[in-house]
Amino acid sequence: MKTVKAVRSDFFPGEGCPIAMRTIQGDAPIQHEGDLTDIRHTHDFAELIIITRGGGMHWIDGISYEVAAGDIFLIQDNTEHYFQERHDLEMYNIMFDDKYLAEHLRSLRSLSGFNAFFLFEPIFRRRHAFMSKLHLAPELMNSLRKNLNGMLAEERSGLPGSDLMMLSKVLEIFVLIAREYSRSSNSKAQTLYRLGEVISRMENQYSENWTVARLSRIAAMAPSTFLGVFKEAMGTSPIEYLLNLRITKAAGLLVNSQKSITEIAQDCGFNDSNYFSRQFRNYYNCSPREYRKRF
């Protein structure tokens, strides 16, 4: 079977916020323009799949998984997938450009459940045999459906500011998912939650003296295993991630506070202000003092 490549311009026309929603009601083929439900495809954006009725077999990167009402899972960009079978399927697809939403998604990293579901579950999907996906009970799914229908109505309204309303609603849905994932009693999900806790701890306590040994204990993993998993999910090492986080926080304080550069360095976990200045220049190609004057 040939793989179709879907691109963001097919779903996010214009310069508005790159968030879109599509729905599938039943088993009829081609239910909307660009419907690739039954066609093996990839896309250069992320897709959140929420199944509200029925079920089927969903093929992801060479493996078929059974899915049913209540299941929620993320398809990351450049992931091959499609429905091999579907039975009375009703689902909502939320498509979004995670690069465009990076600033908002970064804020959500303070939530361990968000990190576990959105960052780590896709990586562990194969080795967990999809047992770490989120599954909502009917009453919770009915509550979420109200949010989904509100988002769908906003997209279809075409009213001024609808892109901002879409953004606010999708962030609300992400928070709801993060909260429910953190409450999951699934042992596989709890493994990922501990990894998510590593990210949220660093985000919320970035000035602390974090080490790989300390972080790997939170994740309940051997340091070597933890380093590999973290690099796969985040694209960098834990220490580089922490350094980037501290520098970013420092940049915000330089612009939004009257604190001295030495105070900001200490607040962000740098005991040596000269070392802080060197690292800051590596990231922003200017000194902290120059950055403050510029902004």
Name the predicted role of every residue range:
Residues N78-A102, R106-L108:
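Ligand-binding loop in jelly-roll beta-barrel domains
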Residues G54, S143-S157, R194-Q205, K249, ...:
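Solvent-exposed, amphipathic alpha-helical segments
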Residues S185-Y193:
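Intrinsic-disorder/low-complexity linker and hinge segments
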Residues V175-S182, S200-T248, L253-F295:
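Basic/polar phosphate-binding segments, predominantly the helix-turn-helix DNA-binding elements
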Residues S112-K169:
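Amphipathic alpha-helical segments enriched in hydrophobic/aromatic residues interleaved with Lys/Arg
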Residues R156-P160, S182-N186, S207:
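Short, flexible helix-adjacent loops and helix caps
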Residues M1-I72, T79-H81, E85-D88, S110-L119, ...:
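Generic protein-terminus/edge-of-domain signal
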